[in-house]
Design a protein with these regions (language model features):
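Outer-membrane beta-barrel pore domains
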Residues: 162-166, 170, 275-468
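The canonical Cys-X-X-Cys-His
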Residues: 48-58
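Short cysteine/histidine-rich metal-coordination sites, predominantly Zn2+-binding motifs
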Residues: 64-78
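C-terminal segment of classical bacterial N-terminal signal peptides
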Residues: 28-37
């Protein structure tokens, strides 16, 4: 889930340098009075572990935290069953942020005396994030659950995660079965992302759609509805997962296809490099089909009636590289492609993302092509201490084939840069608190409404990220 959600209303602020300089100076003043780190809520309260045992910086997991998650939120000892818990233990964590941010976006369409023009819009002020309400753990040993009601800043709730998992089926770590709505098995988890701005608070690779494309169903950053089989070696060095998903982008109520499914597959191998740490390499692939043809009533599409399935795919590699105790780099690559039907604007007609209905007899124009793209994400972290982490991210996505012959080859290309840090003055088994500071710059080619020129957006954000 994105802790902060909004439209991409950003552009480079004029006083960003001075704001960031003041923030960094204050960070080092506070650092001089730092305390030792302790534990995080919910699971920390259950097992009495330091939170740094599972997290590089909460909510991002380290190697041990990933193993704990893969084991179904268990340490694989006789205390995993709820019967060993204190009757007063309540496995719940709330998370929310009060923030200040400055957002600016150029080339927005506004009315003027002579018609419409493009103009920069900039705003700043105090705000709130959404609210996450986490609860999870074990119903019995080797039967795990996780429920996450989540809201936006106006307290409009939905279920981000609802899942139950059978762990260690037949006594083997190689067979675990999960059913419900859950995050896909992304090693670089967007749900545990450290950044919070509108464009920096998501991984663009996980949600990219070419300009004019009608396919919302290939977003690997969205929690999906389905069933997953996952397994791992006892030490978690070798991992695999395979999921069968409804092609509905995690939406409930069967709103889209009458019979459309997707699959997500991932595997990885970790290896020890001595003092450098445990490195991991892996791959992932999402392949599926989604509807382009809809029954209508009075011209409006009927939910659940979608047929005329067309294909899409996303595949790539993941690397997690550690260089001692203080520095690591996460890398993700992706090649994506959609059917030419999606590229022409067919697909999600229910939500208005697509504009065309593939009715019987429809033929694509001769200039139509299957859109394809390549992208890379590089995210380094410097962990000064368990209480202070500096981070950066560079993402770029480049179209390798546009949906139509004659379109400019770089239309819709994205480049984004994010830098920030998080300082935790304390972390206990009852609560967590982080002073969060971040700057994001986002650039997309040729997508302004009137002039079809480039859009540059930016956001600077500071706030108190806390859970309890």
């Amino acid at each position: 889930m994105r802790m902060w959600a909004q439209s991409h209303l950003c552009q480079k602020p004029q006083r960003v340098n001075s704001v960031l300089a003041a923030a960094f100076a204050l960070a080092f003043l506070i650092l001089s009075a730092s305390q030792s780190a302790s534990a995080l809520p919910a699971f920390a309260r259950k097992y009495g572990l330091r939170c740094s045992a599972c997290h590089e910086s909460w909510p991002m997991l380290n190697y041990f935290g990933q193993k704990f998650k893969d084991n179904g939120y268990q340490l694989m000892n006789d205390r995993d069953s709820p019967i060993w818990q204190n009757p007063g233990y309540w496995p719940v964590t709330f998370r929310i942020l009060p923030i200040w941010h400055r957002v600016s976006k150029g080339k927005q369409v506004v009315d003027s005396g002579g018609g419409q023009v493009e103009q920069r819009i900039t705003s700043s002020g105090f705000d709130l994030s959404g609210l996450d309400f986490h609860t999870g753990g074990t119903l019995e040993k080797n039967i795990s659950f996780y429920v996450l009601p989540s809201s936006d800043a106006t307290a409009s709730f939905h279920f981000e995660t609802v899942m139950t998992r059978l762990d260690n089926v037949f006594g083997s770590t190689w067979l675990n079965v999960k059913l419900g709505k859950f995050e896909l098995d992304n090693l670089l988890s967007e749900k545990r992302i450290l950044t919070l701005t509108a464009n920096g608070g998501i991984y663009q690779l996980y949600h990219f759609m070419p300009v004019g494309d009608g396919n919302i169903f290939g977003q690997i950053g969205s929690n999906q509805l389905g069933v997953e089989v996952m397994g791992h070696s006892y030490n978690d060095r070798t991992r695999y997962s395979a999921a069968l998903l409804s092609s509905n982008n995690g939406s409930v109520g069967l709103p889209y296809g009458a019979n459309s499914y997707s699959g997500f597959f991932a595997a990885s191998q970790a290896f020890d490099t001595g003092k450098l740490g445990v490195q991991r390499l892996g791959f992932y692939a999402m392949v599926g089909e989604a509807p382009t043809t809809w029954l209508t009533n009075g011209g409006a599409p009927i939910g659940g009636s979608g047929t005329g399935n067309k294909t899409f795919s996303r595949e790539g590699f993941v690397g997690q590289f550690y260089f001692g105790q203080h520095f690591d780099v996460q890398v993700v690559t992706q090649h994506g492609s959609d059917s030419a039907w999606f590229g022409q604007g067919y697909g999600d007609l229910i939500d208005g993302i697509a504009t065309l209905n593939n009715t019987p007899g429809t033929v694509l124009p001769a200039t139509a092509r299957a859109p394809a793209w390549n992208g890379v994400l590089i995210e380094p972290h410097y962990i000064y201490s368990p209480q202070l982490i500096f981070l950066a991210r560079y993402e770029t996505i480049r179209m390798s084939q546009q949906a139509n012959v004659g379109q400019r080859s770089d239309l819709g290309n994205i480049t984004t840069y994010t830098v920030g840090y998080r300082y935790n003055p304390f972390m206990t088994s009852r609560a967590g608190f982080a002073w969060h500071n971040e700057f994001n710059l986002f650039h997309q080619v040729g997508t302004s409404t009137l002039s079809n020129t480039n859009i540059n957006t930016s956001e600077v954000l500071t706030g108190f990220d806390f859970d309890f």
